[in-house]
Amino acid sequence: MVTPQSPTPMFNGLDDDLYSDAKYAHEINDKMRVPKRIKATGEYSNEDLLLSNQNGMISSWNYHDKIDMNVPDRIVVLGHNQHLETRSAPREIQLENSILPKNPSVGLVRVQTPPRIITLTDQHFPSASEESSPIRANGHHLYGNDLDEDADDEEVHATQYVRANGVARMGFQGNDTNSVESDSQLTTGSASKRSQLNQQQHNNLDASMLAHREGTPMGELTPHEEILYLRRQLAKLNRRVLNIEINNEQRTQREKIVYCLGLAYFVLKTIFWLNRN
């Protein structure tokens, strides 16, 4: 018997926690339970209400169809306000389960584990074996005829020319590998040096990625490295063709000047000879 003089029991939070957890779980179960019947007005009930027939007798053959809620796993829209309820999983999940088992064994894994040690004999890594600098040892850039001599360098050079009216045009651009400036009044200017430096910084990345390790045969290159290698070869060919066309254009200009001077000389000599006679 507890009296006012009896010592008060000490507070024990463990019992209260157990009691509150059990009460919380019971309330959650009651709240998350799906009702057996929901009306169109929003009212619902869990009573087992059976529908009676014309004679007042209750039949249970349509109990599950009219009272219980059957939630299908999949609803397929057929069109024309029609749908199909199925219990099967979607085709994507069925295909994935047919290829990849749900419970793989120890030796079968879905994702390959990356190796802890990577060796150069098995993996492709770029190296600094090939020089990618387009600048000579004396510090001068490559222009004019030096392009033909240094065609094997890693860097792809874009020679820029300036028209007589000051409009700059690129002889070789990344988006148009066959663009060649064949105007008759092309002169190199100071803007070409600045454009060379900008183009050099832009192409350093591709040149560094293209450099592969020493001793790697061409058959072992990855597709990305092969694409970069083909781009470099096309750039070299385009550079040589550009240099040849520039030389041909300059030679044509020189021949025109020589022909004009020679024709003017013979015309003047003819006029002087006629005047003398």
Swiss-Prot record:
**Is the ATP-binding keyword given for this protein?**
no
Disordered, as annotated region: 124-148, 167-200
GO CC field: cytoplasm; endoplasmic reticulum; endoplasmic reticulum membrane; mitochondrial outer membrane; peroxisome
In the record, Phosphothreonine modifications are located at: 177, 216, 222
Q: How does this protein lie in the membrane?
A: Single-pass type IV membrane protein
Keyword ATP-binding included in the entry's annotation: no
Q: Which residues lie on this side of the membrane: Lumenal?
A: 275-277
Question: Which residues are reported to carry the modification Phosphoserine?
Answer: 127, 129, 132-133, 179, 182, 190
- Disulfides per UniProt: none
| Ranges annotated as biased composition (Polar residues) | 174-200
One Pfam family here? Miff
**Keywords for this protein:** Coiled coil, Endoplasmic reticulum, Membrane, Mitochondrion, Mitochondrion outer membrane, Peroxisome, Phosphoprotein, Transmembrane, Transmembrane helix
Q: Which GO terms describe its biological process?
A: mitochondrial fission; peroxisome fission; protein secretion
Residues annotated as coiled-coil are 225-253
Chain segments annotated as transmembrane: 257-274
Give the subcellular location: Endoplasmic reticulum membrane; Mitochondrion outer membrane; Peroxisome
Ranges per topology, Cytoplasmic:
1-256
What family name appears in the similarity comment?
A: Belongs to the Tango11 family.
Functional note: May play a role in mitochondrial and peroxisomal fission.
Q: What is this protein called?
A: Transport and Golgi organization protein 11
Q: Which organism is it from?
A: Drosophila melanogaster (Fruit fly)
Q: What are the leading ranks of the lineage?
A: Eukaryota, Metazoa, Ecdysozoa, Arthropoda, Hexapoda
Gene name of the record = Tango11
